[in-house]
C-alpha cells in the first residue's frame, strides 16, 4: 500500500488530482490518501470525491482534527461506485468518527493501551454497541487527551512504553529531543497511565 500526501498550501485542486492520478496510473499498489492540513495541503471534499474515482485509491486517513472534514470523506466514500473507506487520524475525534462510519484509526493511544483500543474497535465495528464503545472511549480519554495536548507526543509515548511497560525504546530520531523530568511528570499525570495500564491486561 502506498501513502501519499501533498506539500504546499497553494496546491490547487487540479494539481492534487493530477498527482494522485499519476500515482494511480503508474503503480499497481493500493493508495492511501493522507489528509494532514497542518503540515501539507488540505484535501477538499470535492477533491476527495474525484480521488475516489481512481481504482487504486482505496482509503483516506484524515488528520485534519475537524469532524466535518472527516464526515465529508465518509459520506463521499459511501456514495463512491467502488469500496472506499476512511481511517481516523485524530484520537480526539475517535468516537465521532467511528459512529459516523470510519472503519479504523491510526493511533498513538493504541501503542499505550492496545487492549482497550482493540476492545473499542470491536465494540464499534463488530458488535455495533455504541454505548459500550462510548464507555471504553471514556477510559481511553486521558491518554487520548495527553497525546493530542502534550507538545511532544512521540517522546511521551516512548517514555510511557519504557517507564510503565518496561520496553527498551531507545531515543527519538533528531531533531526530536528527549523530555525533561518535569515533562515526564506531566505525561504520567495527564495520561493517568499508571492506573490505566492495569486495565490493559487480559
Predicted regions and their residues:
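Single conserved hydrophobic/aromatic residue that forms the stacking wall/gate
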Residues: 1-8, 12-13
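C-terminal alpha-helical cap/extension of soluble enzyme domains
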Residues: 101-102, 109, 113-202
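Alpha-helix N-cap and loop-to-helix initiation/capping positions
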Residues: 14-19, 43
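Active-site mouth loops of central-metabolism enzymes
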Residues: 10, 34-42
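Catalytic alpha/beta core domains of metabolic enzymes, predominantly
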Residues: 22-25, 39-141, 147-149
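Glycine-rich phosphate-binding "P-loop"
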Residues: 33-35, 56, 173
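Alpha-helix-loop-beta-strand connector modules within alpha/beta enzyme cores
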Residues: 18-32
